[in-house]
Amino acid sequence: MTIHTSRIIMSTDAFLTLTQWLSPGFPVGAYAYSHGLEQVIDCGDMRDAKALQDWVEDILEHGSGTSDGILLAASYKALPEDVSRIDAIARAFASSAERVTETVDQGAAFAKAVDAIWATDLGQLCYPVAVGRAACAQGLPLDLTLEIYTHAFAANLVSAAVRLVPLGQTEGQAVLAALAPLIRQVARRCHDAGIDDLTTACMALDIAAMHHETQYSKVFRT
């Protein structure tokens, strides 16, 4: 019996590259951003794991979890001359000055590291746009890229809440495990979406992100 391993090896290589790019250890400074959750917690609107799960579910389904995925997929599929337009849309979709900083600074840090190691030339792009272009340049599968990106996004929100609420590490991991089916669902939806499908409906979090800009005492940059 002949065993074909080429697809398995290629898939493993893609998985390892993406987990490196989107791990907490990759130098994009993700640990410094709470996406507005610091203000939510400071106001007393998130006190336990159940509230955390509710907030992150909304963000994934109706906020940046979906819009970032759509932007990533659009940049992955785009012709080179269309990338700057997608990046401009990504900046416009950031709902506060700090959110712009969050996506622009992480995108710049990501591009700097990937360009240095994988010999790409990504330029100055917002984070999801940079990830999409890098994945395309390296021939990484879009579906896997979206799943791991969305998981990393959710994991960073959970990590911020674990530190701020505070919650136990096990509680945080239980929330992340419970979010796995939704993460896969959002990634699949973004895979087939186009730039015209961009929408957001996380007004409470957007307002919290705006208030965070003038919050007196804060740990996170956003």
Swiss-Prot record:
Its Gene Ontology cellular component terms are: cytoplasm
Its keywords, alphabetically, are:
Chaperone, Cytoplasm, Nickel insertion
One matching Pfam family is: UreF
The GO molecular function terms of this record are:
nickel cation binding
| Cellular location(s) | Cytoplasm
Assembly and interactions?
UreD, UreF and UreG form a complex that acts as a GTP-hydrolysis-dependent molecular chaperone, activating the urease apoprotein by helping to assemble the nickel containing metallocenter of UreC. The UreE protein probably delivers the nickel.
Give the protein family: Belongs to the UreF family.
PANTHER family, alphabetized: UREASE ACCESSORY PROTEIN F
Protein task: Required for maturation of urease via the functional incorporation of the urease nickel metallocenter.
Return the protein name: Urease accessory protein UreF
The organism is Roseobacter denitrificans (strain ATCC 33942 / OCh 114)
- What gene codes for this chain? ureF
